[in-house]
């Protein structure tokens, strides 16, 4: 048991500089400024550098089948839009810690190559969001519900699963939003700021609200698997779902979550049906309560 614990500590020491390098606030500073001030020129020029060349010499997004670089750019813009509404918690130690945990769990997935970014935002709502390209946000209200690192890993793994399975990207691809954007972006990506921002803003709405039940159930199953692979006690996510399920339906902190997600009781039932007693044989998983980062306020 002690060997497993010290191995996890060693791995975290390796990924600590990487987590610092992937600071979400610094990465999206210009995008957030653009979303709040309406200045998107710099963002569009960056987007252009990741796209293919159009007939007029301008760079174009391949919205229908984006490359990994384009997926990252889409997620970057959408996340910047979300952060324009709710800022990151001003606690560098918290953000660093969440990035360390998230990056370690994400490395257990088949999209370990993505430059994953994680952040905690100033909102007392209980919720979490993911965007294409490896961007994951959880609210301060949800973080308050957590009691140990395994539970944090469980929450993050659910959002990681959404990215790995391209749940939000598929909705964007199916929607008329991409048809709206493709006509413009296929010509000149910097031509019309209003239409571009409509696409990005609506994408943020989709990432925050709109997934069907099957996608949520799949993310729960995959999340438990990723958490277990990462060496954590596998019941972190179910414990969080159970705690949220005990929150009154009329409480404002869960109003959006209950409106846009299956009820936690239904999610727990589906998890039980899918997993059964197979986790009973998992030994040595850690909760790591002793190093769980406590909020300062």
Regions found by a protein language model. Give the residues of each.
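Active-site scaffold of zinc-dependent metalloenzymes
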Residues: 124-149, 159-166
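Short, highly charged
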Residues: 72-109
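Catalytic Zn2+-binding segment of zinc metalloproteases
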Residues: 143, 150-151, 160-176, 188-189, ...
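Sec/Tat signal peptide C-region and signal peptidase I cleavage site
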Residues: 15-21
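Membrane-active amphipathic alpha-helices enriched in small hydrophobic residues
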Residues: 27-31, 176-189, 195-207
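Bacterial N-terminal signal peptides
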Residues: 5-15
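C-terminal capping/extension segments of zinc metalloprotease domains
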Residues: 21-77, 107-127, 166, 211-297
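Acidic helix-start/capping segments at beta-turn-to-alpha-helix junctions
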Residues: 90-104, 116-124, 180, 244-245
């Amino acid at each position: 048991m002690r060997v497993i614990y010290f191995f996890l500590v060693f791995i975290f020491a390796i990924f600590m500089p990487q987590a610092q390098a992937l600071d979400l606030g610094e990465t999206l500073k210009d995008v957030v400024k653009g979303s709040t001030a309406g200045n998107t020129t710099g963002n569009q020029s960056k987007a252009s550098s990741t796209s293919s060349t159009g007939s007029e010499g301008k760079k174009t997004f391949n919205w229908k089948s984006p490359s990994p670089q384009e997926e990252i750019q889409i997620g970057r813009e959408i996340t910047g839009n979300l952060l324009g509404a709710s800022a990151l918690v001003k606690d560098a130690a918290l953000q660093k810690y969440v990035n360390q945990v998230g990056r370690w769990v994400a490395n257990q997935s088949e999209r370990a190559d993505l430059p994953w970014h994680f952040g905690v935002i100033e909102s007392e709502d209980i919720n979490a969001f993911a965007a294409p390209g490896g961007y994951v946000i959880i609210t301060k209200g949800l973080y308050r519900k957590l009691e140990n690192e395994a539970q944090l890993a469980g929450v993050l793994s659910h959002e990681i699963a959404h990215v790995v399975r391209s749940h939000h990207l598929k909705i964007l691809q199916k929607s008329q939003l991409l048809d709206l954007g493709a006509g413009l972006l296929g010509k000149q990506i910097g031509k019309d700021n209003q239409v571009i921002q409509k696409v990005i803003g609506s994408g943020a709405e989709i990432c925050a609200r709109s997934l069907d039940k099957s996608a949520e159930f799949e993310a729960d199953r995959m999340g438990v698997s990723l958490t277990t692979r990462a060496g954590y006690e596998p019941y972190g996510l179910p414990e969080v779902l159970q705690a949220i399920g005990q929150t009154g339906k009329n409480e404002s902190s869960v109003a959006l979550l209950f409106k846009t997600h299956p009820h936690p009781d239904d999610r727990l039932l589906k998890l039980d049906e899918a997993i059964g007693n197979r986790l009973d044989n998992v030994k040595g998983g850690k909760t790591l309560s002793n190093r769980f980062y406590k909020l300062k306020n």
